[in-house]
Swiss-Prot record:
Keyword field: ATP synthesis, Hydrogen ion transport, Ion transport, Transport
Name this polypeptide is given: V-type ATP synthase subunit C
One family name in Pfam for this protein: vATP-synt_AC39
GO terms under biological process: proton motive force-driven plasma membrane ATP synthesis
GO terms for cellular component: proton-transporting V-type ATPase, V0 domain
Family stated for the protein in its record: Belongs to the V-ATPase V0D/AC39 subunit family.
GN (gene name): atpC
One Gene Ontology MF term: ATP binding
PANTHER family registered for this protein in UniProt: V-TYPE ATP SYNTHASE SUBUNIT C (PTHR38682:SF1)
Classification via SUPFAM superfamilies: V-type ATP synthase subunit C (SSF103486)
Lineage start: Bacteria, Thermotogati, Deinococcota, Deinococci, Deinococcales
Superkingdom of origin organism: Bacteria
Function: Produces ATP from ADP in the presence of a proton gradient across the membrane.
Amino acid sequence: MGDSSGSRPTWPRRSAACSRNKVGKDCMPDDYSYINTRVRVMRTKLLDGRALDAALASGSYQEFLRVLSETDFAPNMRETTAEGAGLPELDRALSQNLFDTTQRVLGFADGDAKREIETLLMKWDLTNLKTLARGIVSGRGAETIQQNLIPGGTIKPSVLQTASQSTDLASAATALGVGGHPLAKVFRNAVTAYNTTGRLLDLEVLLDQGYYRYATQVSRDTSLRRYLSREIDITNALIARNSRGGTLDTNLFVPGGSLDAAGYGRLGAGDAGGNADITAILEAPSIEDAEVAARTALDRAARSSAVSDVEGVGIILDFLRRKEIEVAKLRLIGRGKYYDLPTDEIRREVQA
């Protein structure tokens, strides 16, 4: 995979204004053109169907590791083959690869483009904050919480690690406040709401509201705003699906999408307003099926954005989703091979 000629490609040059972090509206397309050229090269190094099939066809866990060591994951795989190594070493290797990838993409950008890419990466921060809150409330312990965190966000790993060792949400909020991350105050306010109602849903929706409020303020790229609007609609549909059978609480509405508060209220009665993606979520037979429908809709939206917005953030958005999916699939395959599960069973999990 990739160029083996050893020659250094000639990249499009960024304008002087963009290089000086003075990225204005006029030079944004040139800046994304540069970043997208780099990301297109990175996209060619994602594992294709044949590589994933080879990993699935591995006869053992050790053979699976050998297959991965012949890909661009090789630099991260050294610990996995050490004596006594197991799934924790594989998890660290895959996590480090995802983190390295996101940091490389971020390193291509500056100015407004960098802030918009950071906004995309902050979606993983949002997920991690929810994982952190659930873990602390349920008493899962720092190690378990850390195993379920997604690397690649914008919160420093050391800050997340410290927060995961907290025994209560207030202490976690204090730990997250170090460094002044945009979502730290959002988390603190969400914890206050949880302490009042005792409902994790209130905390999680306040995190959603805070993230999307920040993201829509930062976003200047048209395709990014369009994608965020779609993501907000999907989020509201999932909230409505989780509340099926009861009256929707308007305090749980996440603004910023195509739905207004009244449209959100109608979701409780199954009225999706003709939106096929929302319909699929509302009519899903289970919460798990609804989440699959949501991921499918967002994957489709990201692919569409990459095709329609070749001079904006669409290609980056699509690449980051593909990379996350790649790592998630390899994690599933690795666990299946480690526990010697039947290949067909692993394949079903990967395809789901």
